[in-house]
Regions:
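Serine-dependent protease modules
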Residues: 1-161
Length: 161
């Protein structure tokens, strides 16, 4: 399979191809061609992260301060050295972005490397190594009608939904 490591610069997407030596059998398939939803979730879960954000509101409080708005979302690790793919709407306008790895109570400060609101994609970077990147398939190899499974963390609680 081929995984992509994406970096965004303004509205331009830069993709580096990273060769992965994982096949369906090695990932837990019983027939060598497909995996159950449970198997997919088991393989993907270590790569799913919780993202929390804070943004200063443009509205002032009664006493002259500013409101802090909180947000939460999901991301997926795309490289061992801390690059994470998420949706741009999760981090757009955030003054603080934190990432929590699956199975860990520790959170990392994240830097938004780039984002594109038109395609709703963003790349974050955390200072960590030895991470488990997701195995990203080739969408050109799919046929109309094949099952697709989305594994994520939409509420920011790592509930493995």
């Amino acid at each position: 399979m081929v995984a992509s490591r994406a970096g965004l610069t303004g509205n331009q997407v830069v993709v580096q191809q990273v060769e992965r030596s994982t096949d369906a059998t090695a990932a837990g398939s019983t027939d060598g061609t497909s995996m159950s939803v449970q198997q997919i979730a088991s393989v993907a879960s270590p790569s799913v992260v919780a993202i929390t954000t804070e943004q200063m509101s443009s509205s002032q409080t009664w006493f002259g301060g500013y409101y802090v708005q909180s947000g939460a979302g999901s991301g997926v690790i795309i490289s061992q050295d801390g690059y994470i793919l998420t949706c741009a709407h999760v981090v757009n306008g955030a003054t603080s972005v934190k990432v929590q790895l699956n199975g860990s109570d520790e959170s990392y400060d994240a830097t938004v490397v780039g984002q594109d609101s038109t395609s709703d994609i963003a790349v974050l970077k955390i200072d960590a190594t030895g991470l488990t990147p997701a195995v990203i398939g080739d969408s050109d190899a799919l046929a109309v009608g094949e099952v697709a499974v989305a594994v994520g963390n939409p509420l920011g609680t790592l509930s493995n939904t």
